[in-house]
């Protein structure tokens, strides 16, 4: 089944059971809808209002206070992120949706599994080796220069360098993820179908036959293999949020020293250790998507604290669009080299 078929075949009883196990029992139900507390964005259930509706005809959620329309896939992402729970898309979202009524919240989350590994090995600055996938899987996909990317500052040379492919059957841009040694440790897909983008997500691991080509994003850096020599020569690394930024940077006039944490606006200790193993590195610059509304400073201090946490190991800094250079959700790379360079000159250095 595709994602739409999965959603269409959801049983209301299974959704109610899942919500109950997540600490959100139904407040009210009639023949058309079930009303739940807004646990989608309230980490504290006591602060939740009774404005999260599940509509039986569409099998979709709608949060009337903040999150708006959501499929069950999107709802789970909101739920985890509101609680700072690190999740694995396949284990904690896809598999949960496929077996709603049997979900055990004490066993289902990926955070204890991955965080314990980072803590165990990160303290001693040791790396563990992620499982490797057969590179032959990439031959399933064709080589193509997707206009969605070539019209957004990504060159043909960048697409070739990072071995970007295209899936005809899934209508997705295929993004191989390699570790620092060039081993294939995951494959992600950038959805092009609008329905899937809105109701499931834009970037997800790829499934071929019965295999999900997934990996813990928190234990790798996209682009590290392709750009490690540039990072070593220039002694600096730009850490972006998404893969697209790494490819956009390939078109700049200076060597590409960019990697991406992929979906996480912050670098963790394990990822920093990957960078610290590159000889001679002197500075790590966080270059994340713009998340601040005018007059706010919460995101500024989030970036500041992330840098401060690791400033004893290496020079840490971050770019921040103070003067409206970026719109909400835009990355520092989206506006091209001139804007990126100007933001870089005015980066915040944290000691």
Give names to the regions the model predicted.
Residues 65-70, 137-143:
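Short acidic alpha-helix initiation/capping motifs at coil-to-helix transition points
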Residues 87-141:
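Conserved active-site segments centered on acidic
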Residues 37, 111-125, 176, 181-189:
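Long, compositionally biased
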Residues 46-48, 168-279:
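Phosphate-handling DNA/RNA-contact segment within nucleic-acid enzymes
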Residues 1-107, 151, 168-169:
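N-terminal structured subdomain of primase-like DNA metabolism proteins
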Residues 1-12, 62, 70-73, 234-235, ...:
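TOPRIM fold recognition
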Residues 150-170, 226-229:
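Short, basic/aromatic recognition patches
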Residues 38, 63, 76, 149, ...:
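Terminal peptide-recognition signature
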């Amino acid at each position: 089944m595709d994602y739409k078929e999965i959603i269409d075949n959801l049983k209301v009883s299974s959704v109610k059971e899942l919500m109950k196990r997540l600490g959100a029992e139904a407040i009210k139900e009639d023949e058309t809808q079930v009303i739940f507390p807004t646990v989608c964005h309230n980490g504290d259930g006591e602060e939740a209002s009774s404005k999260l509706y599940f509509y039986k005809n569409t099998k979709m959620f709608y949060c009337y206070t903040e999150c708006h329309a959501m499929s069950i896939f999107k709802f789970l992402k909101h739920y985890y992120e509101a609680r700072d729970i690190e999740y694995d898309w396949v284990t904690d979202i896809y598999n949960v949706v496929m077996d709603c009524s049997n979900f055990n919240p004490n066993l289902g989350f990926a955070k204890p599994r991955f965080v314990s590994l980072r803590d165990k090995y990160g303290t001693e600055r040791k790396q563990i080796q992620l499982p490797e996938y057969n590179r032959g899987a990439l031959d399933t996909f064709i080589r193509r220069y997707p206009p969605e990317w070539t019209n957004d500052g990504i060159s043909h040379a960048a697409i070739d360098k990072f071995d970007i492919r295209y899936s005809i059957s899934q209508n997705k841009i295929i993004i191989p993820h390699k570790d620092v040694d060039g081993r294939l440790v995951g494959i992600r897909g950038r959805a092009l179908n609008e329905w899937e983008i809105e109701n499931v997500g834009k970037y997800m691991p790829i499934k071929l036959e019965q295999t999900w080509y997934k990996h813990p994003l928190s234990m790798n850096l996209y682009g590290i293999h392709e750009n490690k020599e540039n990072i070593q020569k220039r002694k600096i690394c730009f850490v972006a949020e998404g893969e697209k930024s790494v490819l956009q940077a390939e078109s700049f006039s200076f060597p590409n020293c960019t990697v991406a944490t992929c979906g996480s606006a912050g670098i963790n200790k394990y990822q920093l250790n990957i960078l610290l193993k590159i000889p001679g590195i002197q500075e790590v610059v966080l270059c994340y998507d713009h998340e601040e509304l005018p007059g706010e400073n919460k995101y500024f201090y989030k970036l500041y604290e992330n840098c401060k946490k690791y400033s004893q190991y290496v020079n840490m800094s971050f770019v921040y669009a103070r003067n409206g250079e970026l719109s909400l959700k835009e990355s520092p790379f989206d506006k091209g080299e001139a804007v990126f360079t100007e933001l870089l000159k005015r980066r915040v250095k944290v000691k």
